[in-house]
Amino acid sequence: MLDFLAANPLIALAVILAVGLAIGRISLFGVSLGAAAVLIVALVVSTLNPDIQIPAFVFQLGLAMFVYVIGISAGPAFFREFRSRGWKLTLFMITLLVSLTALAWVLIRAFGLGAGAGAGMFAGSLTSTPGMAAVVALMDPAQAGDPVIGYSLAYPGAVLGSILVAAVGAKLLKVNHTEDAREEGLVTEPLVWKGVRIGEGISGTIGDLPRLSGQQIIATRIVEDPHEHRLADPTLPIKPGMELVINGTVNAVDRAIAALGGECDTKIEDTELVYSRFTVSNPDIVGRTVAELDPVANGFMIARIRQGDTEIVPHRDTVLNYSDRVRVVAAPGRMGEVRRFLGDSEKALGDVNLLPFAIGLSLGLLLGAIPVPLPGDTTMYLGFGGGPIVAGLILGALNRTGPITWQLPFHANRTISTLGLALFLAGVGTSAGAGFRQALTDPQSFVYMGVGFAITVTSALVCAVVGMWLLKLKWDESMGVAAGATTNPAIISYLNDQTGTDLANRGYATVYPTAMIGKILACQVLFLLL
């Protein structure tokens, strides 16, 4: 059977994906490996028969797809967060890499490990394929295999070590993933509506209500009388005694009512306005903000937006994306026009336009291929991991360029992300298996494995301690930073599967570009110091 798989790489890839994804769904003590199990299956299969190899372009394409989609999704939050605290995480990542390089130098010297294999082991402990390649570029061709062996020995422990820290730490600290995400504003409370009567001394426009109340709310209706409502145009002035219907979380609405005046008894049934939900599928409005769409001018108000599993109160800068579910308020006679304006077509969502994805991925790969000169007549490349995520972050933040919408529908985003990750893990697992099997015959191989594992665990623990107690991050975001330090998709995939929130993704995307470039430099510096 193994010889058959070795002779048929495509079938081998399919089998590894099927078995790995099946094992990844098995939960043991509340923990499942998810897509990371594909790596283990690939490593085991190729260790049993080193001739089982997936072509390199398969995992290169998979990694590029995965990190590009991560970048697209995290782009808007990345630049917003960087202005507030992202620079702190970037500075921490630089300090961490310098410290880990020093630790690796001490351990390699203490255990008498070879310079090439030791630098490769360091790259493997941080799962940096570009870092390992950069070390190979500095070496004599006759010894170029040493970093590859060191990398292969440390790589499996690097993946499992970070996952182990994340799993054990979450259990010991009794982490409530949902509550942590809620406190960070990534999980919203159920939204409600109530009537508010504006009190004396409150002045401004309806659009000023969030600022005046200090709460994230939106007014959707002006109550003229119990049976006559009209749309709450944000430009209209407010005045004492005006009655409005506002939307928001329970706490936000109650606090807003207390700040603006008092609650009034209001009913939304049997009025001249009704509400309905539509799905955004019109490519002409995707990637545009609520302010750009000017819904009031089109005869409706957007009361709520459901993005994935999260329902939010929109503001003027909220961007509409494919597959968002929008709750609108409008006159009954205008609902058909509103439906056409938003799209509301499941067929349109199924016909995913992959042209923007292909353009963005191509730009990322081209960016990764640009040589960056370094001291010592060496050259650095962002590669097929760094280039696409940088391009994704930029394009994701732009949302839209002319007629091109960079964002993908939610389900397409998740599908491409999972497929890319699985392809990467299957390919890199089989490529490491051959060297792994050969190296296991040498007792010193276990020293390389142990030292690499120690560096990985140290990195994750430092991220946890500094992240939670110094940078005041939640556990999941700290582990996202740890995953970003290793730039390993398997770890972030595990975190996403276990937490069900975007906290880990936020930390991962913030530090990924710095870690990607920093590790290449760190591996080269370590080799030169040895």
From Swiss-Prot:
Source superkingdom: Bacteria
Entry keyword annotation includes Zinc: no
Biological-process GO terms, alphabetical: carbohydrate metabolic process; potassium ion transport
Gene3D superfamilies in the cross-refs: Regulator of K+ conductance, C-terminal domain
InterPro entries per UniProt: AAE_transporter, RCK_C, RCK_C_sf, Transaldolase_AS, YidE_YbjL
GO molecular function: monoatomic cation transmembrane transporter activity
Alphabetized PROSITE patterns for the sequence: RCK_C
Pfam families: Asp-Al_Ex, TrkA_C
Localization: Cell membrane
Membrane topology: Multi-pass membrane protein
SUPFAM superfamilies per record: TrkA C-terminal domain-like
Main location class: membrane
Keywords, ordered alphabetically: Cell membrane, Membrane, Transmembrane, Transmembrane helix, Transport
GO cellular component: plasma membrane
RCK C-terminal domain boundaries: 260-344
Residue intervals passing through the bilayer: 4-23, 28-47, 57-79, 91-113, 148-170, 352-374, 379-398, 419-441, 451-473
PANTHER family assigned to the protein according to its UniProt record, in alphabetical order: K(+)_H(+) ANTIPORTER SUBUNIT KHTT, TRANSPORT PROTEIN YIDE-RELATED
Family under the similarity heading: Belongs to the AAE transporter (TC 2.A.81) family.
Name the UniProt record assigns to this protein: Uncharacterized transporter CE0595
Gene source species: Corynebacterium efficiens (strain DSM 44549 / YS-314 / AJ 12310 / JCM 11189 / NBRC 100395)
